[in-house]
Amino acid sequence: IDGVPLSISAWQAPREPVPFAEAIQNSFEPVSLGWRFGRAWSTIWLRVTGEVPMSWQKDSVADLAPEIQIDFGYNTSRSGFQAEALAYDLSGKPIKAIAPKNSWLPWSINNKQIDFYLEVAANPDVAGEYTFEPTSFGDWDTAPETALYELKTLQLSRRNVQVWELAQDIWTIRGLISSLPQDSSRRHILIRAIEDMLDALDPADVANSVASGREKLEGVLSSPAAPAS
């Protein structure tokens, strides 16, 4: 929920990746959302700055977790063969890796000033549709100069932790349902629990009804796989 824009500047490494200490000595130029970048196998450094809104600091809520959302135009149906990044603090200490299915960076509400670096590797999709046919993208010297990625999202947001936890609850129960026999009584109990959760959840106000929805799933999530002998 929410969304606060951040200031972004970039430096393109000439060819081979360089260490953090060398990269940050270069001149970073301002870029904005929609910027296209990253010919195959190139490395781009981003500096990201901003500030946590004062209203967030005053109204800090445990269930709202600040995080940096990052999207380089990812195809989230797959985890590899795309751009990946590593976030660093100002001292050069790695904070967290960024990838298509893991494209967020946690941020403390108490860390008012946002200032960090991203080392972005513009990996090309050499697999295609997993046919692994010959491709010019397999080598720097044969790859085209075309920019492969777009800076679609880079902002500070707040994630509703309880809504996220509900999504994990549902994912877990769906996994159980799919693994149980069709005539299993437990399978039907799980399906009924999902139905009860949906009845308790207000689709027009998920944030304020999520607790009621999760409550309907507590019983089936806490019960053992089989009765104790």
Task: Report residues per predicted region.
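Carbohydrate-active enzymes and regulators
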Residues: 1-229
